Design a protein with these regions (language model features):
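Residues lining hydrophobic/aromatic ligand-binding pockets adjacent to catalytic sites
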Residues: 1-219
Length: 219
């Protein structure tokens, strides 16, 4: 199964990964697309959904591997503040904070050099986030697809098949996501398909059970 890269991916993305019986890969050959889950994620707040974006540098037609993260607008501090405000009272925010907060600190060149992934690049930043989240949830993390590999598996891009070998989640045709506890559910109702952080901060170790109990994305 071939997935597009995603920043703190939505629950539906992890639902497919948790239920997948085959090897999962992250596509490294696609061109970057603006205003997608590649560099943005949505959280549930007291006033409703809030989308957080990571600013990037590079042409809109550039390969995803070449997209650099920008330091514009001090986004790291703003994102962490938004998460702390939205989920500070959730059951498992403090439990996972030490695992998640480091992703909102800029690495030094030496730290990047000593790490498996260089956080100056969006794809590598996303990959370390995904591996960390998979380890927390208890599922096998996908691998980066080598550039020279032929596409022999379906591409899951976020649930209707829109092109040969591609399955796209458009937010309308995907199978219904079963509600789970959310902090502001009494005010907003259940907000489906938020970032996986929403599920983790609210459900903790039971997140894997929620993911496996959801209707399969691909029958």
């Amino acid at each position: 199964m071939l997935h597009q890269t995603a920043l703190f991916p939505p629950v539906s993305w992890f639902r497919q990964l948790a239920q997948c019986q085959a090897e999962a890969y992250i596509d490294t050959r696609e061109n970057f697309r603006k205003q997608t889950i590649r560099n943005r994620y949505t959280i549930a707040t007291a006033t409703g959904p809030q989308t957080l974006s990571v600013p990037v540098e590079g042409s809109k037609h550039a390969n995803i591997c070449d997209i650099r993260i920008s330091d514009h607008n001090n986004w790291r501090r703003l994102h962490w503040q938004a998460l702390a405000t939205a989920y500070g009272s959730s059951p498992f925010f403090e439990y996972y904070a030490d695992d998640i907060e480091p992703f909102f600190h800029k690495r030094t060149p030496q730290e990047n050099a000593e790490s498996r992934y260089n956080w100056d690049f969006l794809l590598q930043y996303n990959m370390e986030i995904i591996e960390t989240l998979c380890d927390i949830i208890g599922i096998k993390a996908p691998q980066l697809l080598p550039h020279d590999d032929a596409l022999t598996v379906p591409l899951v891009t976020a649930g209707v098949q829109s092109a040969p070998g591609e399955i796209r989640i458009d937010g309308q045709s995907e199978p219904e996501l079963k509600p789970y506890y959310q902090v502001f559910q009494s005010r907003q109702g259940f907000l489906p398909d938020m970032s996986i952080l929403d599920l983790l901060f609210n459900m903790g170790p039971e997140s894997i059970l929620v993911l496996k109990d959801l209707p399969p994305l691909i029958p």
